[in-house]
Swiss-Prot record:
Consists of three domains: the N-terminal catalytic domain, the editing domain and the C-terminal anticodon-binding domain. Belongs to the class-II aminoacyl-tRNA synthetase family. ProS type 1 subfamily. It catalyses: tRNA(Pro) + L-proline + ATP = L-prolyl-tRNA(Pro) + AMP + diphosphate. Catalyzes the attachment of proline to tRNA(Pro) in a two-step reaction: proline is first activated by ATP to form Pro-AMP and then transferred to the acceptor end of tRNA(Pro). As ProRS can inadvertently accommodate and process non-cognate amino acids such as alanine and cysteine, to avoid such errors it has two additional distinct editing activities against alanine. One activity is designated as 'pretransfer' editing and involves the tRNA(Pro)-independent hydrolysis of activated Ala-AMP. Its main location: cytoplasm. It comes from Cutibacterium acnes (strain DSM 16379 / KPA171202) (Propionibacterium acnes). Keywords: Aminoacyl-tRNA synthetase, ATP-binding, Cytoplasm, Ligase, Nucleotide-binding, Protein biosynthesis. Transmembrane segments: none annotated. Signal peptide: none annotated. InterPro entries: aa-tRNA-synt_IIb, aa-tRNA-synth_II, aa-tRNA-synth_II/BPL/LPL, Anticodon-bd, Anticodon-bd_dom_sf, Pro-tRNA-ligase_IIa, Pro-tRNA-synth_IIa_bac-type, Pro-tRNA-Synthase_IIa_type1. GO terms for cellular component: cytosol. This is Proline--tRNA ligase. PANTHER family: MITOCHONDRIAL RIBOSOME PROTEIN L39/PROLYL-TRNA LIGASE FAMILY MEMBER, PROLINE--TRNA LIGASE. GO terms for molecular function: aminoacyl-tRNA deacylase activity; ATP binding; proline-tRNA ligase activity.
Length: 585
């Protein structure tokens, strides 16, 4: 196919959009691939749509290879199924809700687990109908509180979601592995660096869960890897729990005056002054920091939550929110302290915490706070701390929560070496739903013994529109976009640079022959200067370009590789063959 730029609906911009936060957003707008309509809502222009369609084609090919069948559900959905599964409440403000003219609750679909489950329930009733895998590629809607980074975090986005249905766990395991293998093939074809990491299931529920992250320095997600193969989103890291220590013989707890010790640093300094240790100095790791949050639940209730962790660590609020999802974590305000006078700001200790204590504040501790560990912590009195407070002897928390920050060099939970931090953009998420939705919606089939059994499900999602941004983010440079060949809107761009009909005629001939050979070709036949055409070619980012210009008088054209920057001259007679060889290998 041959497209002429003189007829293409595109306008490149010389200035960055005012709201651009990341390179992909900047270049996709400047190159004329997308345009902002509202916060988190974008129109797709011809070039952007071509990239997205090529990604969709890859997804369809790989889904077909494992026997998945494509369907399409509406975006406008009835609320009743989401109320039955609890997600009408769980999704909270992230759900786009509306009423029809009769006052009936409706929503714009954020995901379609309920719809897939009900359709299979309506049509299938026997184990002979399974296994089954269905998928769709469709627009989704989530009312993001802070849409940002262009199409990386929008309120409308395109997603491929697939669902597997099996009679037993063994079938689900096979379906999960087939999807995982298909995702690996898809991501290998998309042409950017990615990592597969252990993940949380979130409000979807389920057990085994993995994310496919595009590695990007400014990605929203932090993940860890070890040299021994461990990989996980930090939200899913569960550190190894130390063994309990013996309590016998430990010193008794002692309340010590610690004037103005409202920070860990000042507390450690005072501890080393007033109660120096014989073996080593006190450090922040010897202190027990108790941090209080307010947790807002989807049903509108709010409760305080205290978290105890070693003082040299901070609570990672993203990890905390992942554990408590769908609840939302809020700061504990001065008004909250006033309503809970037992909590002395800066000096909170286990003595005032716990559901069995007067405050009734739920108290969860870091896994490192095991029985027999001794701590310096708040005495619930201003300017006073308790030394030698022993877990399991002097206090008992309500439970354990692993939400402390993960640091570079921390040991991997599986003992496979040190953890190394990196950042990425979540593009895919696959997990085993199990029977959560089938139970809620009554999806059962008769097994081979004639007994009704609940179907077990898997869920597999890939952000198609987000993949466009992730690829752009991972491959662009200071000049513009730089598309991998398999997703580029065009295989080749041919530029006619110079005056006179001879140059344009030769450029048109080369472009036409390449198109006849089966390539997608963009011909820059505009009446613009060579400088403008070269700049636009860099911004648009086609993997290969052919420049027909002043070298034509010597029988030469220039072939450029956008990713490597390599330029080489070839004869006019060899141009088409040279380009075909480069494109097809």
């Amino acid at each position: 196919m041959l497209t002429r730029m003189s007829q293409l609906f595109v306008r490149t911009l010389r200035e960055d959009p005012a709201d651009a936060e990341v390179p992909s957003h900047r270049w996709l707008v400047r190159a004329g691939y997308i345009r902002r309509v509202a916060p988190g809502v974008y129109s797709w222009l011809p070039l952007g749509l071509r990239v997205m369609r090529r990604i969709e084609a890859i997804c369809r090919e790989e889904m077909a290879s494992i026997g998945a069948q494509e369907v399409s559900f509406p975006a406008l959905l009835a609320s009743d199924p989401y109320k039955e599964t609890g997600r009408w409440v769980e999704y909270g403000d992230n759900l786009f809700r509306l009423k029809d003219r009769k006052g009936v609750d409706m929503l714009l679909g954020p995901t379609h687990e309920e719809m897939f489950t009900l359709m299979v329930k309506d049509l299938y009733s026997s184990y002979k109908d399974l296994p089954l895998c269905l998928y769709q590629i469709q627009n989704k809607y989530r009312d993001e509180a802070r849409p940002r980074a262009g199409i990386l975090r929008g309120r409308e986005f395109v997603m491929m979601d697939a669902y597997s249905f099996d009679v037993a766990q063994e079938g689900l395991d096979e379906a999960y592995q087939a999807q995982r293998d298909a995702y690996i093939r898809i991501f290998n074809r998309l042409g950017f660096d990615y990592a597969i990491v252990k993940a949380m299931s979130g409000p979807m529920g389920g057990s085994r869960s993995e994310e496919f992250l595009a590695v990007a320095a400014n990605g929203e997600d932090t993940f860890v890897r070890s040299s021994g193969g461990y990989a996980a989103n930090v939200e899913a890291v569960r550190m190894a729990v130390p063994d309990p220590l013996p309590i016998d013989g430990l010193p008794e707890a002692e309340v010590v005056d610690t004037p103005d010790a409202r920070t860990i640093e000042s507390l450690v300094r005072i501890a080393n002054e007033v109660r120096p240790r014989a073996d080593r100095p006190w450090t922040g790791a010897d202190t027990l920091k108790n941090v209080v949050f307010m947790v807002a639940h989807p049903d509108g209730t709010r409760e305080p939550l205290a978290i105890g962790l070693p003082g040299d660590r901070d609570v990672d609020e993203k990890r905390l929110e992942a554990v408590l999802e769908p609840a939302v974590v809020e700061p504990f305000t001065e008004e909250d302290f006033a309503a809970n006078p037992q909590l002395v700001k800066g000096y909170i200790g286990p003595g005032a915490l716990g559901e069995d204590n007067s405050s009734k504040v739920r108290y969860l501790v870091d896994p490192r706070v095991v029985t027999g560990t001794s701590w310096i912590t708040g005495a619930d009195q201003k300017d006073r701390h308790v030394f030698n407070l022993v877990a399991g002897r002097d206090f008992t928390p309500d439970g354990v929560i692993d939400v402390a920050e993960i640091r570079e060099g921390d040991p991997a939970p599986d003992g496979s070496g040190e953890l190394h931090l990196a950042r990425g953009i979540e593009i895919g998420h696959i997990f085993q739903l199990g029977k959560k939705y089938a139970d809620a919606l009554g999806l059962k089939v008769l097994d081979h013994n004639g007994k009704l059994v609940t179907v077990t499900m898997g869920s597999y999602g890939l952000g198609v529109s987000r993949a466009v941004a992730a690829i752009a983010e991972g491959t662009c440079d200071e000049k513009g976009l730089c598309w991998p060949r398999e997703v580029a809107p065009y295989d080749v761009q041919v530029l006619a640079t110079g005056k006179g009909t001879e140059i344009l005629d030769e450029a048109t001939r080369i472009a036409s022959e390449l198109a006849e050979a089966g390539l997608e070709v963009l011909l820059d036949d505009r009446k613009a200067s060579p400088g403008v055409k070269f700049a636009d070619s860099e911004i648009l980012g086609m993997p290969t370009s052919v420049v027909v210009g002043r070298g034509l008088k010597d029988g030469l054209v220039e072939v450029r590789d956008r990713s490597t920057g390599e330029n080489r001259q070839v004869s006019v007679a060899e141009a088409v063959c040279a380009v075909l060889k480069e494109v097809r290998g």
